[in-house]
């Protein structure tokens, strides 16, 4: 009986994974991204998949949100900062993808984790996400907290710099969306690619 339940669970995960991957690929293909610049990782990392991701941060309401809150549903996680136009556009595209998934009766939790916790406090995240999608969960914490969770996901990012030409701060980082299973384990990651006007 237990073996049968495990097999059914794996089948459901496989189907959901295939549907989500297909929808994300098609959405990016027909949106403002060049098809040749869209990268879909087709391999699930055995190392990452062998153990659940562990972290503890604070959401936009100031409440603790940890790895246990990822369990019970699929999650899409994106790392970025509130002052980046590229990140804002990425979140809006994720929002569009979620709407498509909802039409297929696939419920996915969306999580935005800041890479600049000094600037992006819970209050800043709350105001920022209200203008994008109230369903997004925004997470922040101490510098050590963010470093730890970024390392868990192997996120590449550089220290914040000031752009004298634009008069704005920028923080360069990898542009991946991470899909987490309903038991809190890494399943897959997708790169959103580069917009046509950024080539």
From Swiss-Prot:
SUPFAM superfamilies: Thioredoxin-like (SSF52833). Transmembrane segments: none annotated. CDD domains: SCO (cd02968). Belongs to the SCO1/2 family. This is SCO2-like protein RBE_0029. It comes from Rickettsia bellii (strain RML369-C).
